[in-house]
Amino acid sequence: MTTTYALAVIVGSVRAGRFGPVVAGWFVGQAKQRDDVTVDVIDLADTPIPSADFASRIGAADAFIIVTPEYNHGYPGPLKTAIDSLGPQWRAKPVGFVSYGGLSGGLRAVEQLRAVFAELHAVTIRETVSFHGAHERFDEHGVPRDPEAANTAAGVLLDQLAWWAHALRHARAAHPYGT
């Protein structure tokens, strides 16, 4: 039995001056401290969409973390394009969210993404890591100013994601998921 799972961390903003790489960098650091996961960072600013490479990387993943800002009460257009460029690669796999933004911390974007992933037959994880006022929540080195709370939230999300990744990988192997 394989005890590790493949996690794709998708950085959803492509804007100049974006904060996503800071948030994603911290989260990837948390994930890499674990021995139950391998991490592939897919930064949409550096990834052509659509592409065979993107499809292959999403297809190879057992689980996903979407790192998303909230722009105008929603998630970024390039993230929607990336998600919609594929279909079967998302099915019967868990998706977690790390969001950031102003007062809402990106949670409105996350709630919209939950509906999109439900339509793609993916399973979204209830727990979310969220940073309101994100620019003030990290120091100049990309470390959360309240590391205990942030690291605890990341740990809970990663624990739940691992459970679902293993359960759904086993289910997909035993009973291939239909359309």
Model regions: which residues?
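N-terminal beta1-alpha1-beta2 submodule of the flavodoxin-like/Rossmannoid cofactor-binding fold
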Residues: 1-81, 85-86, 144-155, 159-162, ...
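Short, glycine-/small-residue-rich phosphate/pyrophosphate-handling segment
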Residues: 29, 91, 95-140, 148-153
